[in-house]
Design a protein with these regions (language model features):
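Repeated scaffold domains used in trafficking and secretory/extracellular systems
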Residues: 1-8, 38-47, 78-87
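An edge-strand/N-cap motif at the start of beta-rich repeat modules
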Residues: 1-30, 110
Length: 112
């Protein structure tokens, strides 16, 4: 479950304070996002030009390196999201109800 991803020249990670970033390979960290509207961050995935996050409220995305987040999927039919994986052709989600996949960047999910 990646809680740290490389995004261009930065490392971005989940911390107890929210989302942090480093520009010196992790020697020091600065806070980037501390909002609570997304819930608690649990997993990060770089997916194309977006940073995806599994949170306690669903799947969220950022197009600005984690400075702000928007809801991508908050439905309950899939159960609680645990982590995301890029399979190359589709997005996979391990949830409390099993394995789900998405072919539209996480906007909708089908059970595998």
């Amino acid at each position: 479950m990646p809680q740290l991803v490389r995004y261009g020249r930065e490392l971005i990670r989940i911390s107890a304070r929210g989302i942090e970033f480093s520009t010196n390979d992790g020697r020091s960290w600065l806070t980037r996002y501390t909002g609570s509207s997304c819930g608690t961050f649990m997993d990060l995935l770089l997916y194309g030009n977006e940073l995806l996050a599994v949170t306690s409220k669903g799947v969220y995305f950022s197009t600005n390196e984690g400075r702000s987040w928007l809801s991508r999927y908050t439905g309950s039919s899939c159960g609680t999201f645990l982590n995301l994986t890029d399979s190359g052709r589709e997005l996979l989600a391990n949830t409390s109800k099993g394995l789900y996949f998405s072919t539209n960047s996480g906007r909708s999910w089908l059970r595998r």
